[in-house]
Amino acid sequence: MHRRAIYPGTFDPVTNGHADLIERAARLFKHVIIGIASNPSKQPRFSLEERVAQVNLVTAHLKNVEVVGFTGLLVDFAKEQHASVLIRGLRAVSDFEYEFQLANMNRRLSPDLESVFLTPAEENSFISSTLVKEVALHGGDVSQFVHPQIAAALKLKVAQIQLDKEGK
């Protein structure tokens, strides 16, 4: 347990599935960096600063976990953080093909960077940030999929989106 690992993602918002993988990674590695990508191409609902704060809230009890926002290539961020392992989550077989391609690209760009795949607990295997946002946007209750304060933040965000639509 000597390696520094990075669990990268957009975390828009952080879900119970993410939290499950972070807990697992924290048991496996000496130091885990949650790398929150700015990722403007995904048009996140929450700002980078909001997402960093949300993940800090969810991981506050884990002493070997650090949350850092970043822009640019993940392999460059990993080098800056002196990390030798990338943690990626696999919810279903359908995730594997994309993750396999990504792991090979990262290995080509940074040969010393290893990808490790973790699977969430069965009860979290279907949860994605995209689905959580869709449920919230349609007025559904997301409290079973995210931390209570994240559910409240999503509710406020949805209300703001609706106000913005009405104002146009």
From Swiss-Prot:
Annotated positions binding substrate: 10, 42, 74, 88
GO biological process terms on file: coenzyme A biosynthetic process
Gene Ontology terms: cellular component: cytoplasm
Assembly and interaction partners: Homohexamer.
Assigned protein family: Belongs to the bacterial CoaD family.
Function: Reversibly transfers an adenylyl group from ATP to 4'-phosphopantetheine, yielding dephospho-CoA (dPCoA) and pyrophosphate.
Protein name: Phosphopantetheine adenylyltransferase
Lineage: Bacteria, Pseudomonadati, Pseudomonadota, Gammaproteobacteria, Alteromonadales
